[in-house]
């Protein structure tokens, strides 16, 4: 079928919930995607920070093939070896701090949903039934289930789905005074992203980090959403390591499965012990197939020098982006950490226009805000691929800056 015929069929059979445009890809290898017409694109979206080893990575393909031919699913009324092994790796990673217990899910939204439930149960049992409120940040994004939508500090996403889950309160990113003022006897936790991916690639300030530490010292739980920042994207396995934070609960997804549906939340013993059989569950989370993929990805990130590669390629990419900014005058700021990079443009330049210009250069990028474009290559991107991306992106920016 032609691309047009397939898209027409998709429009007739699928919910109209995504602005997919006219791109339809049929295969991928490494950093490249091939569309239905045989055209190849350099992929700096990576499934939105998900395909951290690129497309059709041999380690992932081998893990899927071997495990699928052995055991795919049993449910969580039984133990399975791959999930035990992956949980052990996550909690024994040197930067995990006091994180000690893992619950596997299928997505980031599910991971955050479980984290919110756990925080509320902890608050009720430790401080009383009134202690169930959770503070989150404006411009945050935590998912699209009712609880995670309620935790997401973006009113435009709320308007058609009221009433939201009560007990979620928002403060502005990096407003330490507002954060402290929002805390009361009903507050059990604060939920933050170290870097707001969907919100514009905005990072926690040093002052705000200190305020979070003080609240944590005074008994509030700190939940960190690492769905987009985790699994090495920022240069450490968890981004919170670079902010000097030690969360009570952390959520993971995206890179954890490298394109396979896999999420998790991890908690310290003192918090995790408040969940008992029947408090939370999932049919498919932590299935042997997904966990086998997670094991392969974890091993590759930790053993193949990928974290060092993130640092080197991030420096190379930022250096080239700064040259583009200087040459075009269209860029106001480069933001982010590691290979989670946001390019903020002047207000007259829309992210959609940059994305369209990149399409013309056979390169894929994704928006974060109306004037912020994200660059999210896999962690194993090479120096040559960074050079190619800079050439394509530079040509696109020159076009929109005219």
Language-model regions, residue ranges each:
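Conserved N-terminal phosphate-binding loop of PLP-dependent enzymes in the Aspartate aminotransferase
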Residues: 1-402
């Amino acid at each position: 079928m032609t691309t047009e015929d397939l898209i027409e069929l998709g429009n007739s059979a699928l919910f109209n919930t995504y602005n997919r445009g006219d791109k339809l890809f049929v295969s991928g290898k490494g950093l490249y995607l091939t569309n239905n017409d045989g055209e190849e694109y350099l992929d700096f979206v990576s499934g939105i920070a998900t395909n951290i080893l690129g497309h059709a990575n041999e380690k992932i393909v081998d893990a899927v093939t071997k495990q699928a031919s052995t055991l795919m699913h049993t449910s969580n009324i039984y133990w399975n070896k791959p999930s035990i092994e992956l949980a052990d790796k996550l909690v024994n990673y040197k930067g995990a701090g006091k994180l000690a217990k893992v619950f596997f899910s299928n997505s980031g939204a599910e991971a955050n949903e479980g984290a919110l439930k756990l925080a509320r149960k902890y608050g009720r049992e430790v401080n009383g039934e009134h202690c169930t409120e959770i503070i989150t940040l404006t411009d945050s994004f935590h998912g699209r289930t009712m609880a995670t939508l309620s935790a997401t500090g973006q009113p435009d996403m709320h308007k058609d789905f009221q009433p939201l889950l009560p007990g979620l309160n928002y403060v502005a990113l990096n407003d330490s005074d507002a954060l402290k003022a929002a805390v009361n006897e009903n507050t059990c936790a604060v939920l933050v992203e170290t870097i707001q991916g969907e919100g514009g690639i905005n990072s926690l300030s040093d002052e705000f980090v200190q305020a979070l530490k003080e609240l944590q010292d005074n008994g509030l739980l700190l939940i960190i959403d690492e769905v987009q920042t985790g699994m090495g994207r920022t240069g450490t396995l968890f981004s919170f390591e670079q902010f000097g934070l030690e969360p009570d609960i952390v959520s993971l997804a995206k890179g954890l499965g490298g394109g396979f549906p896999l999420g998790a939340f991890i908690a310290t013993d003192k918090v995790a012990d408040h969940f008992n059989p029947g408090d939370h569950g999932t049919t498919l989370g932590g299935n042997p197939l997904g966990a086998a993929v997670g094991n392969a990805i974890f091993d590759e990130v930790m053993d193949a020098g990928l974290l060092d590669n993130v640092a080197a390629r991030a420096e190379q990419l930022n250096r080239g982006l700064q040259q583009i900014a200087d040459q075009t005058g269209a860029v106001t700021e480069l933001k982010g950490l590691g290979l989670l990079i946001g390019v903020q443009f002047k207000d007259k330049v829309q992210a959609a226009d940059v994305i369209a210009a990149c399409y013309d250069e056979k390169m894929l990028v994704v928006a974060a805000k109306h004037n912020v474009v994200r660059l999210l290559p896999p962690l194993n991107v090479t120096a040559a691929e960074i050079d190619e991306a800079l050439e394509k992106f530079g040509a696109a920016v020159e076009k929109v800056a005219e």
